[in-house]
Every structure is written in C-alpha cells, then in structure tokens.
Amino acid sequence: MRAVVQRVSQASVTISDNIVAQIEKGLLVFLGISKIDQVSDISWMADKIVNLRIFEDDQNKMNRSLLDIMGDMIVVSQFTLYGDCRKGRRPSFTDSATPEKAKVLYDNFLSYLKEKYPINVQQGEFQAHMKVNIVNDGPVTLLLDSQKLF
C-alpha cells in the first residue's frame, strides 16, 4: 500500500462539476493499493498517516500530528501510484491490485480511519475521474509504503 501524503491549507475533489469532498487545514492522501496488499497493511498505513508529526508547533517546528491539530483528511484512490515506468514510455500497472480487491481495501481503510479516529475523513469516488484541487502548505509531501520499499 502506497500513500502520497500532502499537507494542505485546503483541498477539494470534484466529479462532474459536483464537489464531493472539501476540507480546510489537514491532509490530502492519494492511496494506491497493490496486488500483494492485505488487511494488515490498513492499520499500519492509517495509523502512520494520522500520527505523522508534520504540522508546525508554536516554534515553527514540524512537531504536531493531524490528531493534535484536529485537522481534516481527504483520501483519494490512486492506482497509478503503482505505475512502473522503467521500461518503455508507457507505465505498466501490473503491480496494482485488481479493482475488486482495491475497492475492498480502500473501503476498509476509510472505515478504519472513521471508526478509530475523531477526525473528519472525506473521500473521492473509487474509479471515478476526479478533479483534485490542492493548496499545498509548505509544501510538505511525503511518500509512504507499507512494504517499506523506500
């Protein structure tokens, strides 16, 4: 499971001219699910993201988590995070989970966050063409992988 985590001052997701998710200060998470991911990856990834100390404290040091600031989160499914560009010029997505498997793990990821943490979690629509509007704060962008490949 891979996540691109961006600290934002605001973000929104639009589908067919309708805003389906909108937040102020918080995190925008692009979540990719691979064919080898399992349910056990969900808790590791969700807990890591929510507790990352990437928000500034009173001394302008990154020392506070999303929980500390009671920020918001948008999660957007992003199978292209498993695009392999090593050969040729067109990415291969053979490492991405099937849509059926990815949907189950994506939904479980969202449920885990909403049940465990007292934060506002919003989402994009699985397999939809979305327009994601992001106002990066920092910018702060982190790449996480539950298989610890980085």
Curated annotation (Swiss-Prot):
GO terms for molecular function: D-tyrosyl-tRNA(Tyr) deacylase activity; Gly-tRNA(Ala) deacylase activity; Ser(Gly)-tRNA(Ala) hydrolase activity; tRNA binding. The keyword Manganese does not apply. A motif (Gly-cisPro motif, important for rejection of L-amino acids) lies at residues 138-139. Its EC number is 3.1.1.96. SUPFAM superfamilies: DTD-like. Keywords: Cytoplasm, Hydrolase, RNA-binding, tRNA-binding. The keyword Hydrolase applies. The gene is dtd. An aminoacyl-tRNA editing enzyme that deacylates mischarged D-aminoacyl-tRNAs. Also deacylates mischarged glycyl-tRNA(Ala), protecting cells against glycine mischarging by AlaRS. Acts via tRNA-based rather than protein-based catalysis; rejects L-amino acids rather than detecting D-amino acids in the active site. By recycling D-aminoacyl-tRNA to D-amino acids and free tRNA molecules, this enzyme counteracts the toxicity associated with the formation of D-aminoacyl-tRNA entities in vivo and helps enforce protein L-homochirality. This is D-aminoacyl-tRNA deacylase. It catalyses: glycyl-tRNA(Ala) + H2O = tRNA(Ala) + glycine + H(+); a D-aminoacyl-tRNA + H2O = a tRNA + a D-alpha-amino acid + H(+). CDD domains: Dtyr_deacylase. GO terms for biological process: D-amino acid catabolic process. InterPro entries: Daa-tRNA_deacyls_DTD, DTD-like_sf. It is an enzyme of class 3 (hydrolase). It is found in: Cytoplasm. Belongs to the DTD family. Homodimer. GO terms for cellular component: cytoplasm. NCBIfam families: D-aminoacyl-tRNA deacylase. It comes from the Bacteria. A Gly-cisPro motif from one monomer fits into the active site of the other monomer to allow specific chiral rejection of L-amino acids.
